[in-house]
Amino acid sequence: KNDKRDGQGTLIYSNGDKYVGDWANDQISGDGIYSYKNGDRYDGQWKNGFIHGKGTFSNSAGDVYIGEFKNNKMSGWGNYIYKNGNIYEGKWKNDKRDGQGTLSYINGDKYKGKWTKDKRIGDGTINFVNGSTYDGEWKNDYIDGYGTFNYSNGDIYEGEWKNEKKEGQGTFTYFDGDSYEGEWKSNIKNGIGAFSYINGDKYQGQWKNDKRDGTGVINYANGDKYDGHWKNDYIHGKGIFTSLAGGNYIGEWESDMKDGHGTFSYVNDDIYKGQWKNDKRGGTGVINYANGDRYDGNWKNGHIHGKGTFLNSAGDKYIGEWEKDIKEGQGKFIYSNGDR
């Protein structure tokens, strides 16, 4: 028309591409099909020589896009069916997923949320085929920021993330009722945190590599309390143990047992100060009894054992050998009046 292509027509390009469809004022405009030599194909609307409007684009790799275009770019709303079986439905901008959209993975996982320049960025929810779900913030296609992860086994984590790992402050509630609230690093408890056990025990203190490590306090459900050092999840180092029933221990520990030097004040007012081994008095130590008696010497497996001196409240003294709290072996007894 007026020496210009107008209406229906076919153009075969020198590079092997082919267009069949509408023309207006010498430009491709309207509805048409463009077949590329490399196997790509577009069927849809055109405007002033550009793919513009609604249409379907399929590439030689096997991917298919059905949706809106603007100036030769996927822009607006559209569905993208990937060769591998994944399907995206949502907003596009300049050939990239951008805005709200849903990606359904071939394995059954499904993400619904915000996209920016082809990456999950902002708020989004992913439902995993195994039953787990995450709802929260994303950055550069990774779980990153603040969000809640519901695990398929019933565990729940709510808190901060970085590069798909628990990092920063967060609360983990275990399916069995235990819970941890505190600091995380690379998916493990690390820093300061509080752990509440289903049995009623509560620990507050330092963590390292997912274990109680450093200084911390545990309040037991029965009213007992320990305040001191920990290592590899065990009471280890120096600390104070207080029993609700009465009595307390101040001293050294190893692997949850009194081990080293320490002082135990008993509920009956006896006081032992000395060495411990495997949670029992062992080595050398002194015990001052509430009735005024006193023993200073060797101990083994919690018993007076070996050599030692016993002084009773009356002033009588025994110096010699013992076996399991009984005077046994060589020894001498000195009475308060000087008799021997």
Give residue ranges: language-model regions:
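Conserved anchor residues at repeat-unit boundaries in beta-strand-based tandem repeats, strongest
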Residues: K1-D6, K18-S29, R41-H52, V64-S75, ...
